[in-house]
Regions:
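Catalytic active-site module of serine/aspartate enzymes centered on a nucleophile-bearing elbow/loop
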Residues: 162, 170-254
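Surface-exposed intrinsically disordered loops and tails
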Residues: 13-15, 35-41, 203
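Alpha/beta-hydrolase
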Residues: 30-189
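A short helix->loop->beta-strand "cap" motif at the edges of active sites that frequently abuts
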Residues: 9-10, 141-142, 201-202
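Short catalytic/ligand-binding loop motif for oxyanion handling, primarily in non-cytosolic enzymes
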Residues: 21-24, 78, 153-156, 214-217
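Conserved hydrolase catalytic core segment
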Residues: 1-31
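Hydrophobic/aromatic beta-strand patches that form the interior of the parallel beta-sheet core
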Residues: 13, 145-147, 207
Length: 254
């Protein structure tokens, strides 16, 4: 979405996307819960998971190992793949050096006691830095394909990666309540913005995949491939101008 705000685009495909209002810390209409975006950004990263990324951990002996996080967060329960080692190896290429993952945080007087800093991957999604709802006002609106699964643990109206939701269900103590720290309705926010995009003259195609988690392209590769090829004009109604045929390199398996 940010790319489409910064550059002309022929089409836009969103796969299990972050909300247009960032990750955590907003109400449904996108208003920020606190001035410092408490509870969002790098401070929410699990320190043991970060250390295991640094160590290149390939095991599954802990719920915070990259392999366990892949299974519990990135895909739906029961998903298996002969390529799992490759996906975990890819996770372990993440740089945990200062300035990359997860980033820095600062103390906050607001629950849960921290706010995003100024550097790092997770801070880029804090509401103070991330707001792509302006796509509604684009003069030239590329057609949008939105693909997401029904059991996404990461991007959800009840995300297990949203500290406010974790507070509400008792995982994190001291939660100040729904009025102060509600869970972010991520999918509903995306739908609201895309509905407004459609009402303003844009085209939006939504593909909802049952029993699919955060990785539709891995979990339902054939369905994802077909939806993408339809969106960019290779099958069905041709796009104008047509995309280059040399771009077709997508197999229908993972």
């Amino acid at each position: 979405m940010q790319y489409a705000l910064d550059h002309p685009a022929l089409s836009l495909t969103l796969q299990a996307p972050v909300s247009p209002y960032g990750f955590g810390g907003t109400r449904r209409d996108g208003t920020r819960l606190t001035d410092d975006d408490a509870g969002t950004g790098a401070g929410g990263a699990n320190a043991d998971f970060v250390q295991r990324l640094t160590d290149g951990d390939m095991g599954d002996d802990s719920p915070t190992s990259p392999r366990s996080v892949f299974r519990s967060g990135y895909v739906a329960p029961g998903y298996t793949s002969e390529h799992e080692d490759l996906w975990v190896e890819s996770m372990n290429t993440t740089s945990t050096a200062t300035g990359n993952y997860p980033g820095d945080s600062v103390d906050s007087p607001n629950w849960p006691g921290f706010a995003p800093g100024r550097i790092g991957v997770l801070n880029t999604m804090a509401p103070r830095y991330f707001d792509t709802s302006g796509i509604v006002d684009l003069a030239q609106k590329p057609p949008i394909l939105w693909v997401h699964g029904t059991v996404d643990a990461i991007v959800s109206d009840a995300s297990f990666f949203d500290l406010n939701h974790l507070g509400a269900i008792g995982v994190i103590p001291g939660w100040p309540g729904e009025d102060v720290a509600p869970a972010q309705p991520m999918v509903s926010q995306t739908r609201d913005v895309l509905d407004a995009y459609r009402a303003a003259g844009g085209t939006v195609t939504e593909v909802v995949l049952e029993s699919v988690g955060h990785s539709p392209h891995l979990e339902r590769p054939a369905l994802f491939r077909r939806a993408l090829l339809e969106a960019i004009g290779y099958i069905g109604a041709p796009a104008d101008p047509a995309p280059p045929t040399e771009a077709i390199i997508l197999s229908s398996s993972d």
